[in-house]
Amino acid sequence: MAAEKKKFNVDAWEPKTQVGKKVKEGTITDIDYIIDNGLPLLEPEIVDALLPDLEEQVLDVSLVQRMHKSGRRARFRATAVVGNRNGFVGVGMGKSKEVGPAIRKAIAHAKLSLIKVRTGCGSWECGCGTAHSIPFAAKGSCGSVKVELLPAPRGVGLVAGNVAKAVLGLAGIKDIWTKTFGDTRTTYNFAIATFDSLNNLNFVGYLPEHKKTLGINEGRV
């Protein structure tokens, strides 16, 4: 499914957490402040209020079953990704007896898992110093799926599977090479492995002089 933007009415929102109340009052006006200070992100409406340009995309809806003493019980499992195509992305999963609630749960979970993405230009073939790719290679995994992200020169595009392409695109990355291992047909594992590799970029240390040469940027460009 294509990514969608939805309008959020802040006035109709009744926050339940301290962070949510501060956002509605206008005390907190930037999502960076919440993420950088490790504040609890417990309401998806916080993300809606601070990132109005956020897009939502459903990656997969599947029917899952489990055995119970009364017999088989079937539920729908949805996988979704959210992002603003400019340094913020989140992936989530939701389950329910109906498709609609499962999708809504997945989108809400994706918003609560939102991270800042570190972008840059780490390809030796490019060296333009702009935030069109990633500054260095990164790996991530989920279940049997392993994903490796490699910096690519400008103009290459997103060389990745459809699921990884959706996650990387909503994160704001324009050029990248990827390597995948394991059963990538499992949409949720593939999406989380890609998300995990993006998140692992934030834990790579670098020297101050590399910030300019690699064009390292965190969050919005």
Swiss-Prot record:
It holds the Pfam family Ribosomal_S5_C. The keyword RNA-binding applies. Keywords: Ribonucleoprotein, Ribosomal protein, RNA-binding, rRNA-binding. Residues 54-117 form the S5 DRBM domain. InterPro entries: Ribosomal_Su5_D2-typ_SF, Ribosomal_uS5, Ribosomal_uS5_arc, Ribosomal_uS5_C, Ribosomal_uS5_euk/arc, Ribosomal_uS5_N, Ribosomal_uS5_N_CS, Ribsml_uS5_D2-typ_fold_subgr. GO terms for molecular function: rRNA binding; structural constituent of ribosome. GO terms for cellular component: cytosolic small ribosomal subunit. One of its GO terms (biological process) is translation. Part of the 30S ribosomal subunit. Contacts protein S4. With S4 and S12 plays an important role in translational accuracy. Belongs to the universal ribosomal protein uS5 family. The N-terminal domain interacts with the head of the 30S subunit; the C-terminal domain interacts with the body and contacts protein S4. The interaction surface between S4 and S5 is involved in control of translational fidelity. This is Small ribosomal subunit protein uS5. It comes from Methanococcus aeolicus (strain ATCC BAA-1280 / DSM 17508 / OCM 812 / Nankai-3). The gene is rps5.
